[in-house]
């Protein structure tokens, strides 16, 4: 049956003949594998053998090998229903092929085309047991029950005689008995003649059966091939003969055991050694039984395999060794066996170990790293151990050659990394190993800066105890106290101040720690600094005090604390803005109220003559504007800046309709003129704010908007609107014309 020139091919033979087309044509191997498992052809654990491969064609090739080893029935189910569902076009191509090479169908139970036609007609798959193949008959016998019973009885006696011939090693008798018999006949328990010959270790009979076309991949009821039987019994010569003839060393039974598994667990080391030797000859970059042992954490099997010549660093299709699989699955026992046997430890394996973050597994590598890894790889492992705060691993790596002061591509040393992450246990080990504590990052961050930033008081205390200056300067001249203030760490600040940190150091931008705590809204840090008598009047490069920053951020509690500590509520910065200007501009109503309660001047002017009300009006901050107006009892409602603009000009120009209404209700002059003799109505028309224009021209509670007022270029509000080019300007023009009775 091994010939490729026949007219009635079996499913196995179709796979063999069309192997290359199937390997390249199966596009969804994972889907097909799911179907094969669902239909009982393959066991779920077979998925590991296929899924470990990354190349689709390699997956397909291995899947076909496994199918062939499962026998004819498995190959039939592969075609129908599995291939038909997963790859319908490829199935149709195969069906057309087997139909074309068959001119006549004589036995639909055995020929693939008959099987496919039958199943296509039925539309479903029926589970069937492997059929018993009877001795060939030369005469046409009538199909009647009594005669069938006679045949079965005769057949039973015949089979008993065959088994006796095999068990006794009587080759001559076997030749006589099998003249009219298919050598692949299924006997009891799905056993073939080859199964029995292999189990009894009859080498000569095995060779005879192989010459007669005995199939190597047929399985018994336990899913075992003839090679399984030979290996289980320790028949080394027979096992080697079968392996050399092409038997799959990696075929698995129903318990996922290969022949090597069975030989090893039964103590047949000679057989193990021979099969390992055959495996090494036939495999290149494929999964070995040692890989399987690593995945299963079968340390005993791994020991036997290695003792009998298995290559400890053999790579599979993904270029992974058995050690890599053992580590990836967290299988410490097998990993220990592999390491003891000299398995190479590379960076990928160390990465896999760190992914599990299991200290006991990582410790297995430590005595091997110096021999197996480069200095760069050992140093990289040290950084990983520091990152995970594995103190014992850090110590062991340093003892085995890792450079405690190594620097990675980002400029970190292990000390700097531990400080930044706040990993105190790893840091203590590094200090005990005499690591340098005064190294800096490229941006000038010191280990103390990083410890403060991470909030690790433990690390900060160690550094200060070791003599690191608490006033050490970092990026932009920031001290550790600046960072602790920025990150709201009052306990850290207390530690730094206790050991002599300066209370009011300034950065390149002129910021003190109090500035940074105030602008970040850190109430606790501000309280800590004020308790230490920090300078509330200190100004940064913009001339701002801490109160300016608290006001701009709307931090009411900090504003109140600063005022209580003596901060000047009317302090002016470089542009003459007071904290009240900044709070009003941002619309922080409660902050405005707090500052006013602290005697802030509502009419204070900046360098452009703008009051806090100007800022509120420009930015549309209605509530803040209302608070300011109420505080001054509207006395400052018409204050003008250097361009003689009132708050109403700014509110109108920016289209803040509601605020325009508030200002008008507080007696703002509706026709006030700026330096260009523009009224608020001119400003609203120029910027195209229709709602604001409506609010102004419809105001009737007091002085009304002068529609005829002209500015210094002799244009009234209508003419200003007509100069605009937007739809809003057109609508304003129409509105004004109607208001002026120029149109109906």
Curated annotation (Swiss-Prot):
Could you give the subunit structure recorded for this chain?
Self-associates. Interacts with caspa.
Compartment(s) where it occurs, according to its Swiss-Prot or TrEMBL record: Cytoplasm
Outline the ANK repeats, range by range: 157-185, 189-218, 222-251, 255-285, 287-314, 318-347, 377-406, 410-439, 443-472, 476-505, 509-538, 542-571, 575-604, 608-637, 643-672, 676-705
Recorded hits in Pfam families, A to Z, give: Ank, Ank_2, Ank_4, CARD
Q: Name one GO biological process term.
A: innate immune response
| Consequences of knocking out this gene | Morpholino knockdown results in reduced caspa activity and impairs caspa activity in response to bacterial infection with S.typhimurium. In addition, larvae have increased susceptibility to the bacterium S.typhimurium.
Stretch list, region Disordered: 127-146
Q: Which domain of life is it from?
A: Eukaryota
Q: Give start-end positions of Polar residues composition bias.
A: 137-146
The organism that produces this protein has a lineage beginning with: Eukaryota, Metazoa, Chordata, Craniata, Vertebrata
Q: What does this protein do?
A: Probable inflammasome component which mediates inflammasome-dependent resistance to bacterial infection by S.typhimurium through association with activated caspa.
Question: What is the official name of this protein in its record?
Answer: CARD- and ANK-domain containing inflammasome adapter protein
Q: Which PANTHER family does the UniProt record give?
A: ANKYRIN REPEAT-CONTAINING (PTHR24123), CARD- AND ANK-DOMAIN CONTAINING INFLAMMASOME ADAPTER PROTEIN (PTHR24123:SF105)
Q: Which organs or tissues contain this protein?
A: Expressed in kidney, heart and skin. Not expressed in muscle, ovary, gills, eyes or brain.
Q: Record keywords: rRNA-binding included?
A: no
Q: What induces it?
A: Up-regulated in response to bacterial infection with S.typhimurium. Highly expressed in macrophages when infected with S.typhimurium.
State the InterPro entries in the record. Ankyrin_rpt, Ankyrin_rpt-contain_sf, CARD, DEATH-like_dom_sf, Multifunctional_ANK_Repeat
- Key word Nucleotide-binding present in the record? no
Cite the entry's keywords alphabetically: ANK repeat, Cytoplasm, Immunity, Inflammatory response, Innate immunity, Repeat
A GO cellular-component term linked to this record: cytoplasm
Limits of the CARD domain: 7-79
